Amino acid sequence: MSYLFTSESVSEGHPDKVADQISDAILDHFMALDPHSKVACETLVTTGQVVLAGEVKSDAYVELQDIARDVIREIGYNKSAYCFDADSCGVLSAIHGQSADINRGVERTAPEEQGAGDQGIMFGYACRETPSLMPLTLDLSHALLEELARIRKEELHLMPYLRPDAKSQVTVEYSEEGKPLRIDTIVISTQHDDFIQPADATAEAQAIADTEMQARITEDIRRVLLPRVFARYPEDVQRAFDSETKLLVNPTGKFVIGGPHGDTGLTGRKIIVDTYGGKAAHGGGAFSGKDPSKVDRSAAYAARHIAKNLVAAGVADEVLVQLAYAIGVAEPISIFVNTNGTSHVSLSDAEIAKLVDEVFDLRPYAIEQRLKLRAPIYRETASYGHFGREPRKVTKYFSTNSRGDVAHEVELFTWEKLDYVDTLRQRFGL
């Protein structure tokens, strides 16, 4: 019997994602000026206010207020009508030094013996539902909002009422064997201007205006947004969006008040959006604002790198990898692999895990080096998912008061590279 499964995403203007992006932009500035920085930066955003807190050990000095305002401005909160404006919001910092007790567990005389920054469990996942080896429900949810943001920033004339905050949700019908059959429901809630005014001050007139706005936005989503998004996908995904697919746009009828004015945002509150959309387990640790000594982040990236390369190598059609660490200890405490019955090799999942341990050095320092994590690469991860993204090289610029602009050529999303496929095929005899 077929079943339904759903994932959601949120836009870069969602309050929790505003917080994530500020935290990661601050991290990037520290990493750009001192790649050995230890950073844990949390952000709270609400009506007209940004609060920064956390712990830092670094030789760099960064302008926290300027960074926060730049991020808010780039996202699109640049009007007083939003009640959260880059140029007028308050920015309060309570960032202080890193605990010496934590630092002693991380730093070692021999860098390769660097201990994990905390205990914890981290998961990585990959499957064959999409070219990016991500769950279709989440991949589509991200793609819808990425394209909506691009329209808002680059082709606003197509949907001139758009504001930064938005959410999406995609439900897919799967076969009993777990294969996507069709897209059952798409939900899009997008913040918008109050662009149709009521004829008079009555509630009836307001209801008519609200209904007309909702109808206009729904038509534009159907006519402008959806064709652009589905054009990115293979034909089987395009066919999955059929005449029976339900489209729900702004189901409450109106979404004018949004962003940090509508809901307070906090760093680390969208961890399922950031990872696998509920299709795989999550260890509970958030990513944004954390330097790679925090295995919550670096080991989760390593686990995705392993899972993706295993699937791409043909070891299995679906792979879940769990890693576990103890604070101050370099080697992982455990490595677990689950292929959910999709393995193409004559080995148990435990034997696959043993080979993974032999192929991949999973000490924190080795992960940092292999994935090039001691670089300012994190702001780009903080919206539209940390996984399923395209690896690419870019040049990033960071403004400083003392050194002018500092340029870094960096490689983004290195954990998405399929650079271990040949090695794995050889080790597994494929």
Residue ranges, per PLM feature:
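Alpha-helical support elements that line or immediately flank enzyme active sites
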Residues: 12-31, 126-150, 290-314
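N-terminal, positively charged regions that mediate nucleic acid binding
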Residues: 1-40, 45, 421, 427-430
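Glycine-rich, mobile lid/loop segments that gate access to catalytic sites or pores
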Residues: 6, 66, 73-257, 388, ...
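Short, charge-patterned binding micro-sites
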Residues: 39-59, 327-331
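A structural-propensity feature for long, helix-poor, extended segments
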Residues: 48-50, 154-179, 313-351
